[in-house]
Amino acid sequence: MDDEIAALVVDNGSGMCKAGFAGDDAPRAVFPSIVGRPRHQGVMVGMGQKDSYVGDEAQSKRGILTLKYPIEHGIVTNWDDMEKIWHHTFYNELRVAPEEHPVLLTEAPLNPKANREKMTQIMFETFNTPAMYVAIQAVLSLYASGRTTGIVMDSGDGVTHTVPIYEGYALPHAILRLDLAGRDLTDYLMKILTERGYSFTTTAEREIVRDIKEKLCYVALDFEQEMGTAASSSSLEKSYELPDGQVITIGNERFRCPEALFQPSFLGMESCGIHETTFNSIMKCDVDIRKDLYANTVLSGGTTMYPGIADRMQKEITSLAPSTMKIKIIAPPERKYSVWIGGSILASLSTFQQMWISKQEYDESGPSIVHRKCF
């Protein structure tokens, strides 16, 4: 691979797509993984009838569009829309010709086999890329933190995973998936704001609530104590101005919303919280490596960006683990993009260059080549 032809790194998340060039320290393009279609045909005069909008443009015209996310729980469910998102990534965001650059894509751990084959097929057949590779998101996050051993708790918009990794290899038998992430927290915040008398219902209003969540929510170190504080004083109240100028006030919702990560019963789910899931994942590993996992617990993804989450994880895992165990929660400041950053690091390593699946290999073997070359 020539040096002057930089590889493209595309991290397709359920909520946001992060894209850029290998070797960069941050993605050039970050936009919502949304495809919007007009709700009403033919009323938009002078807009030049487009049948679909992607990303920020869909976001800004959301009032007249129906918004759909083609990636649910980390896994692509709508390939036609996914193709639109990739097309938008290459041609509008990065402004590159995909047939000139190798492309590194990311996938959720435990992604169905058919999915990675379909990704491979679209890259080679629709976009004619010269080479491509599919990497597991959590492994990339660990690389970005400068480690090869540790457990990654990766929580984005659509799905949360705990992935133990030893010497660079994910341990599939110990990976746990939790279908509870940012989007569920946004929905939950919509619900508890409704109880306060504010009404948010449409897909467009959901985006407003997501913004409230990102700006004002935090994780309480002690939930019961925080609820007491919120009940007895107004010190935790914050206000937020809606796009129409109306100002709303939120109090205990600020920490009740992300508390669902630790108590999924708030959402009517029977699963364990993220702390217990992390602990269970570690317990599924060989007894000899657990110490290394406890001492290298790495948080990754946008849903780990709440203030207070690392301290709370430290507290919860300490109470679950053996009392003598050293526990360290690593929460890098750039963890929102650590999957992308790990991909950028990986794709620019000289030792990685022989790992790419080339167009020639694809033509000889078909989509199943991805299982042999990408782990």
Swiss-Prot record:
EC number: 3.6.4.-
GO molecular function: ATP binding; hydrolase activity; structural constituent of postsynaptic actin cytoskeleton
CDD domains tied to this protein: ASKHA_NBD_actin
Post-translational modification Tele-methylhistidine, affected residues: H73
InterPro entries the UniProt entry points to: Actin, Actin/actin-like_CS, Actin_CS, ATPase_NBD
Entry keyword set: Acetylation, ATP-binding, Cytoplasm, Cytoskeleton, Hydrolase, Methylation, Nucleotide-binding, Nucleus, Oxidation
Residues that bear N-acetylmethionine: M1
Modified residues annotated as N-acetylaspartate in this record: D2
Post-translational modification: Oxidation of Met-44 and Met-47 by MICALs (mical1, mical2 or mical3) to form methionine sulfoxide promotes actin filament depolymerization. Mical1 and mical2 produce the (R)-S-oxide form. The (R)-S-oxide form is reverted by msrb1 and msrb2, which promote actin repolymerization.
Modified residues (Methionine (R)-sulfoxide): M44, M47
Principal place of residence: cytoplasm
Catalytic activity: ATP + H2O = ADP + phosphate + H(+)
Keyword Repeat: no
More details: In vertebrates 3 main groups of actin isoforms, alpha, beta and gamma have been identified. The alpha actins are found in muscle tissues and are a major constituent of the contractile apparatus. The beta and gamma actins coexist in most cell types as components of the cytoskeleton and as mediators of internal cell motility.
Quaternary structure and partners: Polymerization of globular actin (G-actin) leads to a structural filament (F-actin) in the form of a two-stranded helix. Each actin can bind to 4 others.
Family of this protein: Belongs to the actin family.
Name by which UniProt lists this protein: Actin, cytoplasmic 2
Organism: Danio rerio (Zebrafish)
